[in-house]
Curated annotation (Swiss-Prot):
The keyword Heme applies. InterPro entries: Globin (IPR000971), Globin-like_sf (IPR009050), Globin/Proto (IPR012292), Hemoglobin_b (IPR002337), Hemoglobin_oxygen_transport (IPR050056). It holds the Pfam family Globin. One of its GO terms (cellular component) is blood microparticle. The epsilon chain is a beta-type chain of early mammalian embryonic hemoglobin. CDD domains: Hb-beta-like. This is Hemoglobin subunit epsilon. Belongs to the globin family. GO terms for molecular function: haptoglobin binding; heme binding; hemoglobin alpha binding; metal ion binding; organic acid binding; oxygen binding; oxygen carrier activity; peroxidase activity. The modification Phosphoserine is found at S14, S51. Heme b binds at H64, H93. One of its GO terms (biological process) is hydrogen peroxide catabolic process. Residues 3-142 form the Globin domain.
Length: 142
């Protein structure tokens, strides 16, 4: 189990409260699919994923990205109990969809990049460290 300090929790919660989940979620999933094209195989029912512009403009990518970031919101509310929080999603993604757990780590890293682009100077090294810790813990839980 990962332990988050009060400062880490505060930094993550504060940043998350300012996040546009719909916008950032679409960007994060879209970037994952562009940068790591082998991840597209899990989204063959999303239609046109033939180019970066097609992926980033795809409404299904945006909708699923929002769903993914909404789940990250659940993680923020339950930082001390991530394994239980993600038990059902873990079962779905690993046991039924056979998603390589490495893909969750990649998505977490992409999300940290999105946070940095959205929050600029507010995304200090301390906030980055806390965010990286959270996305790594979520990847492990999944």
């Amino acid at each position: 189990m990962v332990h988050f300090t009060a400062e880490e929790k505060a930094a993550i919660t504060s940043l998350w409260g300012k996040m546009n989940v719909e916008e950032a979620g679409g960007e994060a999933l879209g970037r994952l699919l562009v940068v790591y094209p082998w991840t597209q195989r899990f989204f063959d029912n999303f239609g046109n994923l033939s180019s970066p512009s097609a992926i980033l403009g795809n409404p299904k990518v945006k909708a699923h990205g929002k769903k993914v970031l909404t789940s990250f919101g659940d993680a923020i509310k339950n930082m001390d109990n991530l394994k239980t929080t993600f038990a059902k999603l873990s079962e779905l993604h690993c046991d039924k969809l056979h998603v390589d757990p490495e893909n969750f780590r990649l998505l977490g890293n992409v999300l940290v990049i999105i946070l940095a682009t959205h929050f600029g100077k507010e995304f200090t090294p301390e906030v980055q460290a806390a965010s990286q810790k959270l996305v790594s813990a979520v990847a492990i839980a999944l």
